[in-house]
Design a protein with these regions (language model features):
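A short His-aromatic
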Residues: 135-139
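Conserved N-terminal segment of class I S-adenosyl-L-methionine
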Residues: 1-127, 134, 144-149, 153, ...
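A short acidic, helix-capping loop that chelates divalent metal ions and anchors anionic groups
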Residues: 168-171
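Alpha/beta-hydrolase-fold catalytic nucleophile elbow
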Residues: 161
Length: 221
């Protein structure tokens, strides 16, 4: 078989696999409008080079919640470089969850803090007053995987943030997302409905209109 034939075969197999995967992960299951097309093969997003350029307001919101409700501990799933977690929530007991290369960087940069590899969670006996995932859910082919992890961690509050599709793409956008690392994006109504399937939503707000960041504050059921 020639190289050209092998290349065509690989492309066909990848295309067929993408269609099969898309049929398994129906966007209607995630409360997204009919006709929307998600991305089934997304790029890994390495944000170890970022500090607080994105989603800073989410961490400020979390800090204010913890102070107001006198919470003591937080688990940050997909904490990236850890800068926002340590700088804005450093007065509390923190646990960060990541994958390499971020996981290795976190352990070497902040050895005094607690870091878990994604595959370690949920970890028996590990709990927190607040579990948060800041702009993480849009990276999952099946966001139910993230939801299941959060639900398995005993907590009092949950914070989820994600891009507000209509703000950053316009109401006529039907995907896939422009960001190659995103599988799908929700508008405000869709995200609130999806979060409400799994948690009791007690607040839903736009934390940064320019960046199009929306946030839901929830209580576990």
């Amino acid at each position: 078989m020639s190289i050209e034939s092998v290349t065509r075969l690989v492309r066909t197999l990848r295309r067929n696999l993408a269609e099969i995967t898309r049929s398994l992960y129906k966007d209607s299951d995630y409360c997204i409008k009919p006709g929307y097309r998600s991305r089934v093969e997304n790029e890994h997003h390495d944000d170890t080079g970022f500090r607080d350029e994105w989603q800073r307001e989410v961490y400020v919101y979390a800090a204010e919640l913890m102070q107001r409700e006198r919470l003591a501990s937080v688990i940050d799933i997909g904490c990236g470089s850890g800068f926002k977690l340590v700088s804005l929530l450093g007065e509390f007991e923190t646990i960060g969850v990541e994958v390499p290369p971020a996981y290795d960087l976190l352990r070497s940069t902040y050895p005094e803090r607690t870091w878990f590899h994604w595959t370690e969670m949920p970890k028996p006996g590990v709990c927190a007053d607040l579990v948060m995932a800041s702009d993480v859910i849009e990276h999952f082919p099946d966001p139910g995987d993230l939801i299941a992890m959060i639900q398995a961690i005993p907590s009092r509050y949950v914070i989820l943030s994600t891009p507000e599709r209509d703000l950053i793409r316009g109401k006529s956008d039907f995907g896939p997302p422009e960001n190659q690392a995103h599988c799908r994006e929700w508008n405000s109504d869709e995200f609130r409905r999806y979060a409400s399937l799994h948690f009791d939503v007690i607040d839903h707000t736009i934390t940064n209109r320019e960046q199009g960041t929306q946030l839901v504050l929830c209580r576990p059921r």
